[in-house]
Amino acid sequence: MVVQTRFPSWIILCYIWLLGFAHTGEAQAAKEVLLLDSKAQQTELEWISSPPSGWEEISGLDENYTPIRTYQVCQVMEPNQNNWLRTNWISKGNAQRIFVELKFTLRDCNSLPGVLGTCKETFNLYYYETDYDTGRNIRENLYVKIDTIAADESFTQGDLGERKMKLNTEVREIGPLSKKGFYLAFQDVGACIALVSVKVYYKKCWSIVENLAVFPDTVTGSEFSSLVEVRGTCVSSAEEEAENSPRMHCSAEGEWLVPIGKCICKAGYQQKGDTCEPCGRRFYKSSSQDLQCSRCPTHSFSDREGSSRCECEDGYYRAPSDPPYVACTRPPSAPQNLIFNINQTTVSLEWSPPADNGGRNDVTYRILCKRCSWEQGECVPCGSNIGYMPQQTGLEDNYVTVMDLLAHANYTFEVEAVNGVSDLSRSQRLFAAVSITTGQAAPSQVSGVMKERVLQRSVQLSWQEPEHPNGVITEYEIKYYEKDQRERTYSTLKTKSTSASINNLKPGTVYVFQIRAVTAAGYGNYSPRLDVATLEEASGKMFEATAVSSEQNPVIIIAVVAVAGTIILVFMVFGFIIGRRHCGYSKADQEGDEELYFHFKFPGTKTYIDPETYEDPNRAVHQFAKELDASCIKIERVIGAGEFGEVCSGRLKLPGKRDVAVAIKTLKVGYTEKQRRDFLCEASIMGQFDHPNVVHLEGVVTRGKPVMIVIEFMENGALDAFLRKHDGQFTVIQLVGMLRGIAAGMRYLADMGYVHRDLAARNILVNSNLVCKVSDFGLSRVIEDDPEAVYTTTGGKIPVRWTAPEAIQYRKFTSASDVWSYGIVMWEVMSYGERPYWDMSNQDVIKAIEEGYRLPAPMDCPAGLHQLMLDCWQKDRAERPKFEQIVGILDKMIRNPSSLKTPLGTCSRPLSPLLDQSTPDFTAFCSVGEWLQAIKMERYKDNFTAAGYNSLESVARMTIDDVMSLGITLVGHQKKIMSSIQTMRAQMLHLHGTGIQV
């Protein structure tokens, strides 16, 4: 009896036919590259089956009634089945990792009768790599198993009747592959199975344009997690962004990951979608970094597509430093309204800006000087011996001073406005011109100074006329002083001859003599210094006896007349001094010993001389201030503005000396003669002072424009602003050191008889070593009768907060009123530049002071310092300390730093009432709330209550840290509250005589 081993194939075929109608084919994924698709082949597949009786190829129909080729096997009746089915050789192309998709049906073994021991529900999948087709033999041992394939769903006989479709799909991966191709093989071990379709493919990332970069087709990597980095290629007219080349990564699933880097359109092109298109006419793009094309700037054009810059129209230019987006410009027109002012051999030129600046803001001016002959009118360049102030070219201001011209000569000056494109233009120069004739010049330097005779108390000198007198010499001026005084105190003698005898000198003393000539044009330069030592007492008498005996009676008579004349002169000076005591003080009244303008000069002392006593202010400034050559001064930058002009920083380089940093005050253009006189008055005052704590005057420039006052440069500027900038950063010793320096400078001024009248922290300058120096020796100030009671100057108003009450009420300014101001300066320093009396009005300040109120101690101020402030604020000026005493007190504090740690209120003297704008004595308060309301800080009432400060005694113990812990963050409010607490604490100490523990 023959046992049937093959299950009826029509059952499976029928099921496949049903699937063809029920199953909808899937579209091929765009990221897959097919190597094999059995459904796509309508002819026989002709795969190899081993044994031939195993797998059989049958035909079916898909949903479109298109024939499809499938393989089936159903030998479930016999055990130990080994049926192989092998595909044809498959070329892998560029793939490294292959995907195999199987669609199949499988019969449920339980639905077949009599096959439970032999029926299987799985089959095996194999592959074999080879570089070529090996023929039709299947060498099973060469095949590598991929996996055992099982069905998720199997069908039964009932499914056929009910038309239930159960198609399985499985996908497996192969790789990495190293050879050119491979075979797939299917091993049946006793299942009833039909392969509906076999699809073999690999994945790749398809070409894409991203960020103007083209990324080509890229096969995925060999591993599941591998990423293939691909560098993009810029599209046409694009370039890679600097240090940011375009890259993308192709994932194992055939997807491009987030792009890195990008391409950008080149200059002259802009992006449009995934391409770069050229800029149109009249448009440009200068850089690849720009996003879009821009319209050509004014006075420029582009006549072709893809322009990276626009060309300038005729007559217009673009400077090398101008960016392409700037409009084309042209040279400026000529300056307007050129005027001149001749001062002997110096010419000042001023002009107005050009009507047309060419469309630029970098207009400067340059000066061309020509000297013209009298006869033929021919002109030649002036040469390098001419000086220009501030400079000849690159002038930013509309004025210049030309110096060192020849006397009685013809000159032509051309002033040209230039800008950044002037040198590019080939057009004719545009300038304003003026022709002038110089006048008489000052004489040149006196030479040949010789000592003719030297006695005990006199020296006779002779000299030669200047080589270039430049006119008629009206007189000679002899300046002399003791050598060890170094010009701090000097005398002058004038004569019309070329010799003179200087009398009333000290025996055995070295004197320095210098002589200069004077003409109608002005003063010449001083001659070189001549050192002469007078004879000693004994040798002088012997010499004088010899001189008398040799010259006989005429000399004796002359000596007697000279002595008599000297006595008469002394009496005249005394009379003049007494007369001035009854005439009053020209700036402001001073009392008694404060009128020290014509004191006799005793050895080692020097007296301040009021410049207003000179009929000619120019003589005063030349008497006390050194005239500087403007060419020695280099202005670097503007650092502020004064009452009469700008304040600049710069460098001063005198011949034979190293250059030094200086501050330069300039007189603005268009000044009046009174403004010039007032401006130079400060130099006449400063020139008399020589002290390390008083700002030093280097010199003045009066013979050119701009008129300048040159002083030493103080790096840290005004003291009040400096302290506010460095709030809380200094030790008490450092602050006391600053105060000591200010007091020393004021002591020096007081000893000279000078009353400052405007001492305030804003008028104290600080250098890099924290040395404080007194400054601002400016104009006369007149007190106005207005309710604010302020000084008025031509530059503005000065508040009364620093002024002593008698100076406000009676206009009495003395060193004692300066002491009051110094007390305010002390308060400013210890409070780090806080405004005295805060936001009180001037009228309230005057009223409070009259009622006996004074400023409270600043936060953390030692008691000794505050007591010194109170001493300076004594209403009776006679009870205020002198500056000499103040310096001594501060010196003791510095030598004994422990005295500066004494808390406020431990001093033996009772404190004066302390000023608070609206706070009466603390005993008038019944609660903390009333106290806060009185000082206008009631907003913090809840803060105090929440922290447990319910009594004034507890408040008096508070420190600044306690105040800050309440959540009070405004520094001004912290200081105001703390100042009031210190006031309260001081009054408690005074009332109870015992300290309050803090």
Swiss-Prot record:
InterPro entries referenced in this protein's UniProt entry, alphabetically: Eph_TM (IPR027936), EphA7_rcpt_lig-bd (IPR034283), Ephrin_rcpt_lig-bd_dom (IPR001090), Ephrin_rcpt_TKs (IPR050449), FN3_dom (IPR003961), FN3_sf (IPR036116), Galactose-bd-like_sf (IPR008979), Growth_fac_rcpt_cys_sf (IPR009030)
Protein name, please?
Answer: Ephrin type-A receptor 7
Function per UniProt: Receptor tyrosine kinase which binds promiscuously GPI-anchored ephrin-A family ligands residing on adjacent cells, leading to contact-dependent bidirectional signaling into neighboring cells. The signaling pathway downstream of the receptor is referred to as forward signaling while the signaling pathway downstream of the ephrin ligand is referred to as reverse signaling. Among GPI-anchored ephrin-A ligands, EFNA5 is a cognate/functional ligand for EPHA7 and their interaction regulates brain development modulating cell-cell adhesion and repulsion.
Query: What does the PTM comment of the record read?
Result: Phosphorylated. Isoform 4 inhibits isoform 1 phosphorylation and may regulate its function in adhesion.
Signal sequence region: 1-27
PROSITE patterns (UniProt xref): EGF_2, EPH_LBD, FN3, PROTEIN_KINASE_ATP, PROTEIN_KINASE_DOM, PROTEIN_KINASE_TYR, RECEPTOR_TYR_KIN_V_1, RECEPTOR_TYR_KIN_V_2
Pfam families named among the record's database cross-references: EphA2_TM, Ephrin_lbd, fn3, PK_Tyr_Ser-Thr, SAM_1
Q: Which domain of life is it from?
A: Eukaryota
As its record notes, the protein acts as a catalyst of:
L-tyrosyl-[protein] + ATP = O-phospho-L-tyrosyl-[protein] + ADP + H(+)
Entry comment describing in which tissues the protein is expressed:
Widely expressed in embryo. In adult, expression restricted to hippocampus, testis and spleen. Expressed in myogenic progenitor cells.
If researchers knock out this gene, what phenotype do they report?
A: Mice are viable, fertile and show no gross morphological or behavioral defects. However, topographic targeting errors of nasal and temporal retinal axons appear during development of the retinocollicular projections in the visual system. 10 percent of the embryos also display exencephalic overgrowth of forebrain tissues which might be the result of reduced apoptosis.
Coiled-coil zones: none
| Extracellular side stretches | 28-555
Q: Which residues carry this modification: Phosphotyrosine?
A: Y608, Y614, Y791, Y940
Q: What positions does the domain Protein kinase occupy?
A: 633-894
Question: Can you state the subunit structure given in the record?
Answer: Heterotetramer upon binding of the ligand. The heterotetramer is composed of an ephrin dimer and a receptor dimer. Oligomerization is probably required to induce biological responses. Interacts (via PDZ-binding motif) with GRIP1 and PICK1 (via PDZ domain).
UniProt-listed GO biological process terms:
brain development; branching morphogenesis of a nerve; ephrin receptor signaling pathway; modulation of chemical synaptic transmission; negative regulation of collateral sprouting; negative regulation of phosphatidylinositol 3-kinase/protein kinase B signal transduction; negative regulation of synapse assembly; nephric duct morphogenesis
Where in this chain does the record put each Eph LBD domain? Answer: 32-210
Kindly report, in one word, the top-level EC class recorded for this enzyme.
transferase
Q: Which organism is it from?
A: Mus musculus (Mouse)
Task: Answer whether the UniProt record assigns the keyword Glycosyltransferase to this protein.
Answer: no
Task: Write out the GO MF terms.
Answer: ATP binding; axon guidance receptor activity; chemorepellent activity; ephrin receptor binding; GPI-linked ephrin receptor activity; growth factor binding
Q: Which gene encodes it?
A: Epha7
Identify the residues that bind ATP: I639, G640, A641, G642, E643, F644, G645, E646, V647, K665
The catalytic residues are: D758 (proton acceptor)
Grouped into one coarse class, the protein's main location is membrane
Glycosylated residue positions: N343, N410
Q: Sorted alphabetically, which PANTHER family does this protein's record hold?
A: EPH RECEPTOR A5, EPHRIN TYPE-A RECEPTOR 7
